[in-house]
Amino acid sequence: MLSAIYTVLAGLLFLPLLVNLCCPYFFQDIGYFLKVAAVGRRVRSYGKRRPARTILRAFLEKARQTPHKPFLLFRDETLTYAQVDRRSNQVARALHDHLGLRQGDCVALLMGNEPAYVWLWLGLVKLGCAMACLNYNIRAKSLLHCFQCCGAKVLLVSPELQAAVEEILPSLKKDDVSIYYVSRTSNTDGIDSFLDKVDEVSTEPIPESWRSEVTFSTPALYIYTSGTTGLPKAAMITHQRIWYGTGLTFVSGLKADDVIYITLPFYHSAALLIGIHGCIVAGATLALRTKFSASQFWDDCRKYNVTVIQYIGELLRYLCNSPQKPNDRDHKVRLALGNGLRGDVWRQFVKRFGDICIYEFYAATEGNIGFMNYARKVGAVGRVNYLQKKIITYDLIKYDVEKDEPVRDENGYCVRVPKGEVGLLVCKITQLTPFNGYAGAKAQTEKKKLRDVFKKGDLYFNSGDLLMVDHENFIYFHDRVGDTFRWKGENVATTEVADTVGLVDFVQEVNVYGVHVPDHEGRIGMASIKMKENHEFDGKKLFQHIADYLPSYARPRFLRIQDTIEITGTFKHRKMTLVEEGFNPAVIKDALYFLDDTAKMYVPMTEDIYNAISAKTLKL
């Protein structure tokens, strides 16, 4: 009897070791699932409360519990939770009393990273209004479109972006839009100032009755994403979605004594949903910078005692490419949250800057599925978690890149790919994993839905991303499909770029696509152009045109002049061969041009330019 007991005890003692040998990620998988399940239970309980518990409630609790704790660090300025609370009260009152806004209205914000962005957003939440986060890089037609599709009544804009707003001012005034500079004065006719009105009103708390109609399904934010066709689309972010966005910071172990350094633009979901809102939930501190600077990055980390950083893959590559310094490891950063990090850059970053815990993740602003590399497998974006997959239904399906559509079998259903093969990520649309769609774009919302995927009547979200699951169940990002590519951390819609280039008088037809550049994340823009008869290419005119209408990351850096632009059997532009051929003048016999920022024109692409790009002596 005693020997049997000893045998059982020995078995229990060695069980964890045996499990670890047979299933090395078992305990990590279980731990991750339990954390994610806890987030889900918590969010669902928040939604059942009346009124629903939004992210604002978490902020108000932190402001009451730790009023004097630093919330925002910017340059040499420190704002506490209480100060931001009072300032956002003034914002809500000014919007209510002077601008006549009420819950359910939408306000568009066009400004860079600064403390005002945060307390303007909190003021809008206190009033029950939604905020549209406009990309300050876009101009003219795209900017006007982004404003109009969200149904905003008011535009709040930074004075530094005066030229951008004045360009569309007549159209805004025609639509009876109220425009205000986030300043105390205005020198533009038709644009008023806002901060002087904020200064005049009380800092007293805002009555809950001002936001009494807000529920979990109420739109809180509109964040813009370039999709597979056309102009940017406004992804609708509900108050429920904001809570799920903070899940990453909970799973990664963000703490109240952390200082989070954000250089990513606030109009991105990463900085807003994960950075700002994650900080609020943890009761931590945010250190802000208007724009990323590789030379100042670690100095800022030391200045603000930063412990957590946010990144996109490009950002960490810039840091690795910066000149080495003796104090590269002299910092307190323990955690890095982000996506798009290549395996080689990951290794180089950790080797140079220390054993920083990197939490790579995969997600899309409007998507209903996300992954997290909680096992810290270099190069992966996540793992197939068996328990999670029992709750959330997703798959990788075969995709015909040439036809730009999923492959279907003889019965008309999609085909799952085996491990080791690349497939299109799709996730079933359910109450637990909803797809809220795009504001003012029903057709584009429908295009992101896949019907009759595995059986008649089922409905899935089409991520537009190609991923691969290896034989250890790790998930790897492969590429985007269709007419979108990613460069400098931004999605670029090829049709929007093509429409812009096509407005130039000597251009007959345009085919825009992204090409790979060695040692760079994403793909850089390239355009194949067919000239109009009896017209000559003008590199200076084309440069000026795209500089006026496209942000820098969307401008085609390479041009290829072709006599004929090939199309598919469904009359779509053929891109695969062009993508594979890239921009090497030794391979391509067509006329090639390179966008020269210094000369402010497109110049002939030479071997010297190509070699300089390959050697990374010419920055793109």
From Swiss-Prot:
Modified residues (N6-acetyllysine): K291
GO MF term (any one): enzyme binding
Keyword match Cytoplasm: no
Membrane topology: Multi-pass membrane protein; Peripheral membrane protein
Enzyme class: ligase
One Pfam assignment: AMP-binding_C
EC number(s) recorded for this UniProt protein: 6.2.1.15, 6.2.1.3, 6.2.1.24, 6.2.1.7
TM ranges: 5-27, 107-127, 262-282
Lumenal topological intervals: 1-4, 128-261
Compartmental location: Endoplasmic reticulum membrane; Peroxisome membrane; Cell membrane; Microsome
Keywords of the record: Acetylation, ATP-binding, Cell membrane, Endoplasmic reticulum, Fatty acid metabolism, Ligase, Lipid metabolism, Lipid transport, Membrane, Microsome, Nucleotide-binding, Peroxisome, Phosphoprotein, Transmembrane, Transmembrane helix, Transport
Biological role stated in the UniProt entry: Mediates the import of long-chain fatty acids (LCFA) into the cell by facilitating their transport across cell membranes, playing an important role in hepatic fatty acid uptake. Also functions as an acyl-CoA ligase catalyzing the ATP-dependent formation of fatty acyl-CoA using LCFA and very-long-chain fatty acids (VLCFA) as substrates, which prevents fatty acid efflux from cells and might drive more fatty acid uptake. Plays a pivotal role in regulating available LCFA substrates from exogenous sources in tissues undergoing high levels of beta-oxidation or triglyceride synthesis.
Family named by the database record: Belongs to the ATP-dependent AMP-binding enzyme family.
Protein name per the record: Long-chain fatty acid transport protein 2
